[in-house]
Amino acid sequence: MRAKIVAGNWKMNKNSEETEDLINELIDKLPTNSNAKIIIAPTFINLASAVDHTEFTNIRVAAQNMHQAENGAYTGEISADMLKSIGVNTVILGHSERRAIFHETDAIISFKVDTALRHEMTVIFCFGEELKDRQNKQHFNIVENQLRDGLFHIDKSAWANIILAYEPVWAIGTGETASPEQAQEMHEFIRETVRKVFGSDIAEDVSILYGGSVKPDNAKEIFSKPDVDGGLIGGAALKADDFVVIVNGI
């Protein structure tokens, strides 16, 4: 049975003191017997502290990004080995903001995936279409292409370390809203696309998270869909009470 997962992407928020406070609040309020795997992704400078504070809890810590190279003259970058050395074994790759703001291509993201898997890290692989793609009815093609370019070259065995996170970019901060039915439609398509290439076992085992503005008031309905295995949460992950409601909705 595939894992249910709720991952909180904190983005560029929370200084060191605020990070510690939020983690302590989550430890106090999150259920210890949750059906969901719980992941938080603080900023780079707070990862080591987060790992220490969550050591004896059911909360796992992830990085928001990493560089594809092992080391070298890449000012401002962080490598997989550096993350592993402080106990971070999970990384978010291909996030829509990395693609749009920092111009990360499918090729760059694919290299990052390869590096992370080489270091036996778990990859939360993000992908999804923009508003113009959906308006032009190209959304299925875009999603399939991103999956193919980013993941379809990896070995079957590597899928044990892959979590998929579908981000409908057109429904994030645009005023547009993706319905639970639209989420299910795309998640079903994603699972069938994986099935065609890698078979039913991998397709049924891989967790597919929804990353389209999940909030306390819509989480339970979205998570009730058969191919939605949890969420990649943005703004709502920065408030402990909101995040707890979302986790309880799984």
From Swiss-Prot:
Major location (coarse): cytoplasm
Keywords: Cytoplasm, Gluconeogenesis, Glycolysis, Isomerase
GO molecular function, one term: triose-phosphate isomerase activity
Pathway where it operates: Carbohydrate biosynthesis; gluconeogenesis; Carbohydrate degradation; glycolysis; D-glyceraldehyde 3-phosphate from glycerone phosphate: step 1/1
GO BP term, example: glycolytic process
SUPFAM superfamilies reported in the protein's UniProt record: Triosephosphate isomerase (TIM) (SSF51351)
Intracellular or extracellular location(s): Cytoplasm
Active site: 95, 167
Domain of life of the source: Bacteria
Cystine residue pairs: none
GO cellular component: cytosol
EC number: 5.3.1.1
Annotated binding of substrate, by residue: 9-11, 173, 213, 234-235
Pfam families cross-referenced by the UniProt entry: TIM (PF00121)
PROSITE patterns: TIM_1, TIM_2
Catalytic activity: D-glyceraldehyde 3-phosphate = dihydroxyacetone phosphate
Protein purpose: Involved in the gluconeogenesis. Catalyzes stereospecifically the conversion of dihydroxyacetone phosphate (DHAP) to D-glyceraldehyde-3-phosphate (G3P).
Subunit-level organization: Homodimer.
Family recorded in the similarity comment: Belongs to the triosephosphate isomerase family.
NCBIfam families in alphabetical order: tim (TIGR00419)
Protein name: Triosephosphate isomerase
Organism of origin: Flavobacterium psychrophilum (strain ATCC 49511 / DSM 21280 / CIP 103535 / JIP02/86)
Encoding gene (name): tpiA
